[in-house]
């Protein structure tokens, strides 16, 4: 058995011998792709893709040559299409002037036909451009948008600035309603606040929030159709109820304003097995499901033909519900204008064109858009865990520079000057120190590996379908293999169902106050024409999920005998009754980008386990390596 001094000398000799290896020269200006193609690293790989706009516009570019008080619409359209940004002053000007126009409008708009009605946009700017191709040029087409311009998509601020600019140019023909996502609570929980802070500043975000509070809540189209974002409320009897709302504030979590932003038709709308008009909305975690009877009674009471709303993704881009018995017209219509929602729903989008008492649905498919790393992460931050893992792999390789056989070789050329340890206890202590150092390096390698895995999963939307049939991270991951696991619209919808709930209160590490409504002050494919209805007997599917946590604070109860929205809680399909108070939340979502906070805590917990040696996935090979190097007397016995 070779002595420790001999083994040390052998290791040094092995390192010296390997230091003479010639390092091959590498041309870093060229890179070979997986298909064998050689590309230049100093040029754009895909030359036919236009480079992003790397500058902010000058005042001469920004202002219109026709009217110096308004932005140049054509320039903005192209500039945003190239991912360009404005100066903060230019963005704030658009939000201020657009907000003033919105504030001057009533809660309930009255708009005439012909008109094009559009549903949710959700930050899909490139699809918004396609929408205008399908629906018509805003310069000569009347438009009504039903809300949800922001969140989920990564181009929300471009959608807002462009639509607000159009409002400045066409205040009498382009109308914007408020959706449930136009509030501080949801924009902080999802992506819009993060996007504003990344692309502009929190000042721009706050200006957006103030402007959102000016958005009208509803519209009557052609004196026949009520257009709202969500649905009906037990507090909504006549249209005058809408006119009396104080809309210049953050949406409450109960009451009429909440319901018209959050309510949905019942899942089995038109074939209900209940006599109730309103049932607790367990999918949203607040507001109500309204029934066919509730819709028919409201329409008859207000002499209207139908309710046009958005708020729910639709596979075909739209849905017509059961017809009323008196008019034979669909009682409710849902329009959704974000194609291939979240890049995985594979749904079509649609707009509703109403002209000369003829209603046509125009469908369109998604448009390719630039890719963003999760949560607007830069490539250096994204790649750091990968680099760290490789560095620790190199360090471990250095420690394992020679084999056990090389360590055991006897060679008279190396003098044995080092004294043999005489104290067995001291030798054991030294061996333990060496072993601990090697294991520490191994744990650091595990930490970097863990960080890399967590980076890969930052944007992943975890499936919580009881069967776990769908892999975690399918809805926001760019990996094609993960996307292929989703078979269709319903798979995507069921996996994303938790994100349809009213989020819990969350506290930003940079802020002292929770981002909740109560914390915010009150502030003053080729398109084709298709049949205008589809079979209304196909139910909307929606499976309630197990609640994750309770986090919503209680709101103010309604006055005695006044119907109030049950914000959250209770068993599914609980009928409203007088005095039905607000309860705590049954639901939250683990899957939005705001979970960066909770994901970070989880990652730190895992790292502590690894560093503390509690990680069950420890490297057995590293353990054996540490044992061999630190215990030379056992080297011949181990593998």
Curated annotation (Swiss-Prot):
Cofactor binding, per record: Binds 1 Fe(3+) ion per subunit. Binds 1 zinc ion per subunit.
Residue span of region Disordered: 494-602
Cofactors (names): Fe(3+); Zn(2+)
GO MF annotation list: calmodulin binding; calmodulin-dependent protein phosphatase activity; ferric iron binding; zinc ion binding
Binding positions (Fe cation): 120, 122, 148
Binding site residues for Zn(2+): 148, 180, 229, 311
Family affiliation: Belongs to the PPP phosphatase family. PP-2B subfamily.
Primary role: Calcium-dependent, calmodulin-stimulated protein phosphatase. This subunit may have a role in the calmodulin activation of calcineurin.
Protein name per the record: Serine/threonine-protein phosphatase 2B catalytic subunit A1
Gene that encodes the chain: CNA1
């Amino acid at each position: 058995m070779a002595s420790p001094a001999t083994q040390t000398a052998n290791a040094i000799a092995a390192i010296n011998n390997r230091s003479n290896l010639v390092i091959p020269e590498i041309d870093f200006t060229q890179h070979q792709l997986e298909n064998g193609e050689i590309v230049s690293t100093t040029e754009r790989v895909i030359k036919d893709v236009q480079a992003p706009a790397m500058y902010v516009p000058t005042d001469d570019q920004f202002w219109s040559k026709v009217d110096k008080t308004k932005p140049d619409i054509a320039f903005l359209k192209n500039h945003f299409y190239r991912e360009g940004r404005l100066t903060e002053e230019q963005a704030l000007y658009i939000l201020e002037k657009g907000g003033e126009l919105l504030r001057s409008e009533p809660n309930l708009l009255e708009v005439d036909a012909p008109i094009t009605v559009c549903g949710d946009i959700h930050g899909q700017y490139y699809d918004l451009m396609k929408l205008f191709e399908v629906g018509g040029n805003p310069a000569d087409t009347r438009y009504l948008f039903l809300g949800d311009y922001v969140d989920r998509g990564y181009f929300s601020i471009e959608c807002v600035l462009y639509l607000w600019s159009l409002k400045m140019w066409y205040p009498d023909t382009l109308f914007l309603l408020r959706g449930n996502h136009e509030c501080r609570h949801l924009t902080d929980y999802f992506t819009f606040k993060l996007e504003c802070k990344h692309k502009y500043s929190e000042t721009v975000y706050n200006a957006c929030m103030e402007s959102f509070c000016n958005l009208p809540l509803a519209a009557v189209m052609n004196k026949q159709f009520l257009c709202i974002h969500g649905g009906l409320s037990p507090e909504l009897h006549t249209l005058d109820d809408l006119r009396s709302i104080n809309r210049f504030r953050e949406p409450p979590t109960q009451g009429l304003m909440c319901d018209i932003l959050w309510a949905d038709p019942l899942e089995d709308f038109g074939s209900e097995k209940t006599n109730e008009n309103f049932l607790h909305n367990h999918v949203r975690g607040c507001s109500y499901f309204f029934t066919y009877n509730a819709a028919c009674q409201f329409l008859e009471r207000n002499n209207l033909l139908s309710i046009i709303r958005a708020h729910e993704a639709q596979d075909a881009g739209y849905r017509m519900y059961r017809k009323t018995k008196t008019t034979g017209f669909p009682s409710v219509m849902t329009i959704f204008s974000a194609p291939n929602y979240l890049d995985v729903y594979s749904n079509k989008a649609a707009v509703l064109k109403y002209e000369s008492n003829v209603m046509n649905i125009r469908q369109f498919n998604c448009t390719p858009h630039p890719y963003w790393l999760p949560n607007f992460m830069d490539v250096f931050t994204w790649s750091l865990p990968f680099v760290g893992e490789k560095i620790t792999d190199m360090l471990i390789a250095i420690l394992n520079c020679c084999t056990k056989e090389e360590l055991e070789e006897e060679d008279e050329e190396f003098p044995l000057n080092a004294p043999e340890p005489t104290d067995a206890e001291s030798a054991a202590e030294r061996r333990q120190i060496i072993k601990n150092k090697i294991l520490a390096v191994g744990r650091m390698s595990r930490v970097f590996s863990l960080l890399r895995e967590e980076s890969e999963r930052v944007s992943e939307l975890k499936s919580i379908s009881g069967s776990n049939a769908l892999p975690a991270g399918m809805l926001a991951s760019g990996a094609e293999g993960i996307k292929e696991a989703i078979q269709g619209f319903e798979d995507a919808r069921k996996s994303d169902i938790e994100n349809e709930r009213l989020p819990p209160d969350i506290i930003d590490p940079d802020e002292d106050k929770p981002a909740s409504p109560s914390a915010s002050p009150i502030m003053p494919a080729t398109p084709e024409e298709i049949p205008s209805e589809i079979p209304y007997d196909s139910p909307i599917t929606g499976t309630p999920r197990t609640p994750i946590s309770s986090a919503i604070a209680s709101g103010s109860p309604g006055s005695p005998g006044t119907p109030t929205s049950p914000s959250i809680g209770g068993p599914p399909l609980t009928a409203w009754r007088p005095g039905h108070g607000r309860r705590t939340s049954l639901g939250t979502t683990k899957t939005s980008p705001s979970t960066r906070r909770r994901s970070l805590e989880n990652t730190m917990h895992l790292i502590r386990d690894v560093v503390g040696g509690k990680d069950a996935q420890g490297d057995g090979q590293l353990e054996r390596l540490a044992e061999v190097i630190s215990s030379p007397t056992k080297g011949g016995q181990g593998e």
